[in-house]
Amino acid sequence: VPAIRKAVDPSLWIQNEGKLDWAIKKGLVEGMTPETWVAFSSVADAWRRANSHITALWEGLGNACQEAIGTPNRIFTAGKKLSVKRQGAYLYVRLPSGRKLVYPAPALSGERCDMTYYGIEQYSKKWRPIKTYGGRLVENATQAVACDLLLEAGPRLEEAGYEIVLSVHDEYICEIPDDETRNHRQMEELMSTLPTWAEGLPLVAAGFESYRYRKE
């Protein structure tokens, strides 16, 4: 904690000390000392300040979804590549690839217009309303875009002679001849090739060659 206090902007520390009573009432400080909570919150705020484009997208997508839920059949945008529309009982977030994320039974509740949709709750495994917010929605979209890029790369690899025998999260495992005709450098290049909808995205793949599967 002392090291964090020295490293962060003093104004962030003071700001979070001012939020401490609120955090205690909300139960956010359970399991840690008040000073530890202030330290953690100050680090989070410092990250947000240093990554303002990301936090702006959190807010932008959150606002777009709230507007769309309250105004069916109208398209709202977030950032340069995302659009949102409520149609019938579903909220659609259109990704850069054209694929859509679908949130069933979207609704706004409470004074803060908290967003909910129906899904399988993580712990109870029951179908119920799930709260969400801008940051979580951007996380969903980011993971979906990564999935789209991986799926785009699959056929490209196989057309070049890299037979995919297994996928693990964001990895493709290919079986190739034990000679010089193919190698992991070529595979990296194929996986880093951007589709037109992702133009300008900084995408890099890293791989290795081995006689058995392992984590790098």
Task: Give a label for each model feature.
Residues 1-216:
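Conserved catalytic core of nucleotide polymerization and phosphodiester-bond processing enzymes
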